[in-house]
Amino acid sequence: ADANVNWCVYSLMQHNVPPDIPSKDLGSINIGLFHGASQGVVPADYPDQQVTAFRAAMDEGRHTSDPVLTNFKSKFAIDWSPFLNSKWTDAADTAVPLAELQRLGKRITTVPDGFAIHPLVDRVIKDRRAMAEGKLALDWGMGEHLAFASVLANGYGVRLSGQDCGRGTFTHRHAVLHDQARERWDSGSYTPLQHVADDQGEFTVIDSVLSEEAVLGFEYGYSTAEPNKLVIWEAQFGDFANGAQVVIDQFISSGEAKWGRVTGLTLMLPHGYEGQGPEHSSARIERFLQLCAEHNMQIVQPTTPAQIFHVLRRQMIRSFRKPLVLFTPKSLLRHKEAISSLDDLAKGSFQLIIGESDKRIDPQKVKRVIVCSGRLYFDLLAARREAERDDLAIIRVEQLYPFGQKAFEAEVKRYAAATDWVWAQDEPQNQGPWFYIQHHMQDAFKDGQRLMYAGRPASASPAVGYYDKHYAQLKELIATAFGDSKPAKRSSKAKS
């Protein structure tokens, strides 16, 4: 049936009407009386009935429909249920069969015919082919590449972004190759990791803009929507991560505790004291450790290609998603002793703690044990050889948090005769892992065993600016670690 709609409009006489005029009750017109009732279409009291019914419904407050939608799933929703209620101690088989490693090694060292590679990069590719064939030991770049390739072959995606991550700040990666005969600067690139298998996961590598906060913030958000992709943000130097401190504090370290927002984001922060000054030495390990609680993050400082291989694979294969902060090396990228074999990848796994590697060191004769993390291990190793010391052992802590307490206690039992235990670190005493790790170490000690500190003195700056001063500090901390100099800090668990 047709219906008439009547509008009654009261003019407020332009915009400058005094406010007291429109506030007065100007009355209203009962349209129903004018039309419907007079024509016999509706009863005369119909409008009043509708008003009464409306007000009664409003007063009752009854919901006409269930405000909670059931069985609803947004098309953008991500299923995180497979990764809930898991633990960091859950086992993960990160080993890859030797034949598969060799196949992957061949694929990532194959380039298209006629592709002109830069001579220096060509040497890197040829060396990697020799590594895949077992003719050379694996270096850091190859361990990393095989980790990416194997993860991709397993169907997971890999996304790597940062200010210089295609090549790598220290030219160790070369994930993207460039044709030296290209006619245009923006063409002629080839990415071997995009060609490891027919049904592989997606590999993306992005040289980002020079903004740590913006890029890390984006990658954090991306990672919360991609549980099956290894999302990595790499800082040009670990020192520059402080430009994104808000993202680290507000989201990465505490997002799950505050909002239940899970992420498997990985941070690669180049860290190490090589005399490059206060802005290119420290990724501030102490700050990340201070943020750790309730198993909210994983803090790892790997020292071998096998370790970076297994920890990257563990991040995806294990049904456990927490942020992974990797303090990656700089000088170890080409260090002659920071190497691994294909067997280490094919048969091994990630080690929370790496014990003494020299079989000539007799645990029963060891009186002093040095515990450290990162690149300092290789300086200590070289100094021990030079001094021809066989009465001290060197242990590496590869995962700082969550701390492998049982693994460390096993090392303490192994050196039951050792009374002097030393934590040695590159960083100043008020920085680095010292204040965090000493409690874990002391909890494992028996009566009569004491803990000492060997490292740089407390400093407002992360590092000194002169190489000579840097080297003098290094010599002093090694002497302290070996017991040839007075320790800067001493605590004990001796009998009272």
Language-model features: where?
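Flexible, glycine-rich loop/tail regions that form catalytic "lids" or insertion modules at the edges
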Residues: D2-S496
